[in-house]
Structure formats: structure tokens, C-alpha cells
Design a protein with these regions (language model features):
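Hydrophobic beta-strand residues of extracellular immunoglobulin-like
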Residues: 53-57
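Conserved acyl-donor/pantetheine-binding loop and adjacent beta-alpha core of acyl/acetyltransferases
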Residues: 61-64, 69-98
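Residue-level recognition of the GNAT/N-acetyltransferase active site
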Residues: 97, 102, 106, 133-135
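Conserved acetyl-CoA-binding loop-helix of GNAT-fold acetyltransferases
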Residues: 101, 107-120, 147
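Conserved active-site alpha-helix within GNAT-family acetyltransferase domains
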Residues: 112, 124, 136-154
Length: 176
């Protein structure tokens, strides 16, 4: 469902945010934007295609300016651990597996708004947290996440690939 995000009165730019899936008539535009802005993320999109996911597209003057895609999954099994539970309830997370903003649209708050949309949707879906992984060198992405309050855990994978695992807690464990 489209929602207006901002209007620039000087240039009459119309920006809207929509949720798309593979049946959306403009799905190919997302794939084209993915190929142009973040081709290294395509394997993660294709790998997760068999799981329920949500794609949020931000349109600037009716063109895909940025997107964020996440899956809702139990916390644990993705890293070969048993599902985490709290008080007998299995915890779920919104795991971001694709996020990019066209180079020409960067620096306008689009990436921040997309991240905020995921946080809002994840809360509405009953997720315990939002999780995301990013390679080192993605400083704009890191800046957005850290500015929004995500926690960060740097890590190195077996092939000496350095990255950061980001977590945004959504629910408190307070007993009060």
C-alpha cells in the first residue's frame, strides 16, 4: 500500500513507500535496481526466495530510488543454533537481507526511512529484534544503523571477510 513520505515544494518531488512481492507488476524494476545498486546482494535475495519475505520499495517520482527486503525467521537456526525462546515463546526476528539506495538518491534520508519502515513493520509482526549483516566499507549503511540505535558486533568469517552484525532490540525483557 503506497504511503507518502515527503514532498519537496521546490521541485514537486513525490516520494512514496510501497510493499511489493514477486506478483507486483513492477517487480522487475526492483530486480533492475538491485542489479545496478547492489549486485552483490542478489544471491541473498535469490537464496531467500523460498521464504516469506517483505520488500519495501521507496519510489521517487515513480522510480525505484531504494529498497529494503527482510524475512521473518526464528532467532538461532540461521546460524545452526536451536531457536531461542523466552518464557516458552519462540523468538522471531526481521532479518534484513537486501538494502540499497540508488547513488543519485543518496544523502536524502531515503536509507534511514527504509530502515525505520522495517523497524515499524517488525514491531507490528511481533518480532523480538531486527537483525542485519553488513560488510566493512559500507560506511553509509553503518552510519544509518548506528544512528538509529542498532547494536554492533564486528566479526570475521573464515575467509577473512570482515563485517558487522547489527541488532535492534524491539521488545524488552522487563518483568515490570
Amino acid at each position: 500500500m503506497p504511503s507518502n513520505f515527503l514532498m519537496n515544494s521546490k521541485s514537486e518531488i513525490t516520494v512514496s513507500i510501497e510493499e511489493w512481492d514477486e506478483s507486483h507488476p513492477r517487480w522487475q524494476e526492483f530486480l533492475a535496481c538491485l542489479e545496478i545498486t547492489a549486485p552483490e546482494q542478489a544471491p541473498f535475495v535469490n537464496q531467500k526466495a523460498n521464504r516469506a519475505h517483505t520488500l519495501i520499495a521507496l519510489l521517487n517520482n515513480n522510480e525505484v530510488a531504494g529498497f529494503i527486503r527482510f524475512v521473518v525467521q526464528p532467532i538461532g537456526p540461521e546460524v545452526k543454533c536451536p531457536p531461542l525462546s523466552l518464557n516458552g515463546i519462540e523468538l522471531i526476528e526481521a532479518k534484513i537481507n537486501a538494502f540499497a539506495v540508488r547513488e543519485s538518491a543518496r544523502g536524502q534520508g531515503i536509507g534511514t526511512e527504509l530502515q525505520k519502515q522495517v523497524i515499524r513493520r517488525a514491531k507490528g509482526l511481533g518480532c523480538y529484534q531486527v537483525a542485519s549483516y553488513s560488510s566493512y566499507g559500507k560506511t553509509a549503511n553503518h552510519h544509518i544503523k548506528l544512528s538509529l540505535g542498532f547494536g554492533a558486533q564486528p566479526e570475521v568469517h573464515g575467509d577473512n571477510h570482515q563485517g558487522v552484525y547489527f541488532i535492534m532490540p524491539l521488545n524488552s525483557c522487563d518483568d515490570s
